[in-house]
């Protein structure tokens, strides 16, 4: 619940009336439900059929499949969010084209991405849970994101850390390695990653 509130603060950073919000990769709809309760006009896209059905029941609205992104009209949304989704996209060029198209003027695209230059990524190496092989098709850094969007009309406004992610990813990494006390060790590594990121700027997720 805390993480959902933090996500909403990032996505809706200023007071807007009747915000039209699209969450791509919405899962079972928890973030969209919170946004709906806050007065947003919500739309979701989810590739997993089971998760999509749960979200539709929870939100009482139709959740789109990824293929339906191309059918969304131009200038449809004030905000588009992708929480750990872009790294799963096979065709980045086409995806970004549609993101530009469906955003309104002065609209915002919010991306959350695992950062493979973070301390926890370097610590766990190939066991880092956020690599999520083979589902993660792209491993992106702050530099690569800037380069990808350099050729678009979208402008990078700000980069903010998702500080809770370092703990979650570190605990998962410990579990993948079948280590004892994975919860405690993950918390310690997540804390150390955040501490180092305060100097380096390389947070576990951005």
What are the language-model segments listed below?
Residues 42, 156-157:
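Hydrophobic anchor at the start of a short beta-strand
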Residues 3-127, 137-151, 162-164, 205-206:
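Conserved SAM-binding loop
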Residues 124-133, 173-179:
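Short glycine/proline- and charge-enriched loop/turn segments
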Residues 158-206:
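A C-terminal cap/extension of S-adenosyl-L-methionine-dependent methyltransferases
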Residues 1-4, 12, 118, 184-187, ...:
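Short helical patches
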Residues 59, 133, 155:
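Residue-level signal for beta-strand positions within conserved beta-sheet cores that form or flank
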């Amino acid at each position: 619940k805390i993480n959902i509130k933090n996500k909403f603060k990032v996505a809706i950073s200023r007071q807007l009336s009747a915000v039209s919000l699209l969450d791509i990769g919405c899962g079972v709809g928890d973030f969209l439900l919170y946004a709906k309760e806050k007065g947003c006009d919500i739309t979701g896209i989810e590739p997993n059929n089971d998760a999509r059905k749960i979200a539709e029941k929870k939100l009482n609205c139709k959740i789109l499949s990824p293929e339906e992104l191309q059918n969304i009209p131009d200038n449809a949304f004030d905000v588009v969010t992708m929480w750990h989704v872009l790294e799963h996209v096979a065709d980045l060029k086409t995806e970004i084209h549609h993101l530009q198209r469906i955003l309104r003027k002065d609209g915002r695209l919010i991306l959350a991405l695992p950062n493979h230059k973070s301390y926890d990524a370097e610590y766990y190496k190939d066991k880092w849970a956020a690599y999520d092989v083979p589902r993660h098709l792209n491993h992106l850094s702050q530099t690569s994101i800037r380069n990808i969007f350099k050729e678009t009309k979208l402008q990078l406004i700000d980069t903010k850390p998702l500080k809770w992610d370092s703990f979650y990813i570190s605990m998962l990494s410990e579990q993948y390695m079948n280590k004892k006390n994975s919860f405690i060790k993950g918390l310690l590594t997540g804390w150390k990653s955040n501490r180092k990121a305060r100097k380096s700027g390389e947070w576990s997720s951005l």
